[in-house]
Amino acid sequence: MGDKWIGVALSDPLRILASPLVILRRDDDAKTVENIEALVKTHQPDLLVIGLPVSLNGTIGPQAEKVKAFSGLLSQSLNTEIIFRDERFSTDEARRKMNDSGKNNKTVRDDAAAAAVILQDYLDETNPPCFQP
């Protein structure tokens, strides 16, 4: 979650695959909360996974504090669980995936793709793979 843009991703109903959904312009907090409320109403997720910009040394810096403060506003208006995930390197991974798929150029925003990386990491960690013989 940045100061200007918020990438949004959504998982499939089985919580196996995360996909980029939309990029929200972050104007003021009230409008941004309203936009996220609309997405939650439309898609009815079980929870929100929010990327937390942890510093490379693992500490919570000023940007992470901003994210936590904004998430507090969200939790006041939504009846949805919020989980934080370390978002370090998510943009780099998203750019690599976009480049590998031929979709990477300077005019394409990668915020939603980075959100999908963060969500996919969460899904992979919480849903162990299963195999049908």
UniProtKB/Swiss-Prot annotation:
Record-linked Gene3D superfamilies: YqgF/RNase H-like domain (3.30.420.140)
Cystine residue pairs: none
Listed GO MF terms: nuclease activity
Gene Ontology CC terms: cytosol
Pfam families: RuvX
Intracellular or extracellular location(s): Cytoplasm
Highest taxon of the lineage: Bacteria
Acetylation as UniProt keyword: no
Keywords noted in UniProt: Cytoplasm, Hydrolase, Nuclease, Ribosome biogenesis
GO biological process, one term: rRNA 5'-end processing
PANTHER family: POLYNUCLEOTIDYL TRANSFERASE, RIBONUCLEASE H-LIKE SUPERFAMILY PROTEIN (PTHR33317:SF4)
Entry-linked HAMAP family: Nuclease_YqgF
Annotated protein name in UniProt: Putative pre-16S rRNA nuclease
Species of the source: Dehalococcoides mccartyi (strain ATCC BAA-2266 / KCTC 15142 / 195)
Classification of source organism: Bacteria, Bacillati, Chloroflexota, Dehalococcoidia, Dehalococcoidales
